[in-house]
Amino acid sequence: AQVAGVRVRAPMMQIHTVAAGGGSILHFDGARFRVGPDSAGANPGPASYRRGGPLAVTDCNVMLGRLNPDFFPRIFGRNADQKLDRDIVAAKFAALAEEISASSGKKISAEEAAEGFMKIAVANMANAIKEISIQRGYDVSKYTLACFGGAGGQHACRVADELGMKRIFLHPFAGVLSAYGMGLADVRALRHRTIETQLSDAAMPTLAGALDELAREGEAELLAQGIAPSAIEIERHVHIK
């Protein structure tokens, strides 16, 4: 599987991902704007979360007035009792705008800097959709853009415009879809081991013992998470070359 162009050797659903979420960190290398692929995550999170995080895509929306701190619960800061911090976002973007102006020789405002990074993030999202649609012969203008995630509604219209799409589907619970999916997903523990040996009757006890050991490790992990022994099912798979 690949994540943001990086090949990962891990079990994964066939989903094309792009590093352009709300936590994607903003970079200026002296010549160009870049968004991601590294992320501030949820902790420390973007600068507006009041945990000392860097400027991220979410902060662009705060700077541009598309996220109003007054409409969010006071769950930010070290004690999770403060609202989003627009002041620190404005200060950081002002400093970044000065850096960009000094490097480019063209004076830009904090809002213009935020808008520039926003355009990069939207382009990254649109290009990811193009890769699995237009590049495979599909006309995306005939499809509906389905959005989810806490930041889905913030970027849906601009991504749709970039792709020439006319219709957007935004479910009322789109913001908690990932959490809902995790809540419904089976709890699993995966274990694997590579064994280089000839497949023969003599090797069977060793191979069976390895499977038993992996099963015990996986079962122990699930028991530690509070899963009842009666609810645990063990599946064994062997890939032979």
Task: Name each region found by the language model.
Residues 1-241:
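N-terminally biased helix-coil "hinge/interface" segments that flank
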